[in-house]
Regions:
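Helical mechanochemical/support elements of P-loop NTPase systems and associated helical scaffolds
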Residues: 2-3, 50-57, 81-84, 107-110, ...
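Phosphate-binding loop that captures ATP/GTP phosphates
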Residues: 2-49, 55-57, 62
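Short acidic, glycine/serine/threonine-rich loops at helix termini
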Residues: 8-12, 45-47, 86, 140-141, ...
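Glycine-rich phosphate-binding loops of nucleotide-dependent enzymes
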Residues: 35, 58, 77, 90, ...
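Phosphate-binding/switch loop-helix module in NTP-utilizing enzymes
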Residues: 41-88
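Conserved catalytic-core segment of NTP-binding enzymes
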Residues: 71-72, 78-176
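C-terminal boundary of histidine-terminating zinc-finger modules
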Residues: 179-192
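Short, hydrophobic alpha-helical segments
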Residues: 200-212
Length: 212
């Protein structure tokens, strides 16, 4: 987690990672090893970085962290097609990319560029996820499509990549991020919890397929 590093807060990981023999030790949260730049800098500090600094930070998180054996390493990248993405693809062989977009046309422009970039860099695009797909009223249960609906699915079909699922705009998703208890742990059978678990299963299946 490099840009806008909030991973540690969302996972409830507190404190600073240990350093053993010059290498950062990932912090454990909910059975997952995690490292975020947010663990290393003051929470109020603004990280204003140029391209070379971004690439240096990515290299540090990849090379200077004692990750050990992992099933999957997930890297959260900022929107767009900038230095962070190019640096990562040059540093390690990527198993695949998941593109996340809200449904409206203006957001899908960036998603389209992301798909094109990864394809040009020979990185498998595992698919698109539609975030904030709809708002579910907690009182009456009515769904309101604040940002439109189905844009990511249509874009995926147009570009010939899989559609991985949709995540609704829900108060409990916001609350889980603030509390540091992932929704798939705190409320796995809630609407949001089911959405996350379904997408995770689809992504895991796609990763296994590309690995073979």
């Amino acid at each position: 987690d490099g840009h806008g590093p909030s991973l540690h807060r969302m996972m409830g990981a507190k404190g600073k990672p240990d350093v053993v023999e010059g290498r950062l030790q990932p912090m454990q949260a909910w059975g997952i090893c995690a490292v975020s730049l947010g663990m290393l800098v003051d929470e109020k500090a603004a990280m204003i970085w140029r391209g070379p600094m971004v690439m240096g930070a990515i290299n540090q998180l990849l090379s200077d962290v004692d990750w050990g054996e992992l099933d999957v390493l997930v890297v959260d990248l900022p929107p767009g097609t900038g230095d962070a993405h190019l640096s990562l693809t040059q540093k390690v062989p990527l198993g695949g990319a998941v593109i996340v977009s809200t449904p409206q046309d203006i957001a899908l422009i960036d998603a389209r560029r992301g798909v094109t970039m990864f394809e040009k860099l020979h990185v498998p695009v595992l698919g698109l996820v539609e975030n904030m797909s709809y708002f579910c009223c907690p009182n009456c249960g009515h769904n309101t499509e604040l940002f439109g609906h189905g844009g990511a699915r249509r874009e995926a079909e147009a570009m010939g990549v899989p559609f991985l699922g949709e995540v609704p705009l829900l108060a409990d998703i916001r609350a889980s991020g603030d509390s540091g208890v992932p929704l798939v742990i705190g409320a796995p059978n809630s609407e949001g919890g089911k959405a996350y678990r379904a997408i995770a299963h689809t992504v895991a299946t796609a990763i296994q397929a590309t690995a073979h």
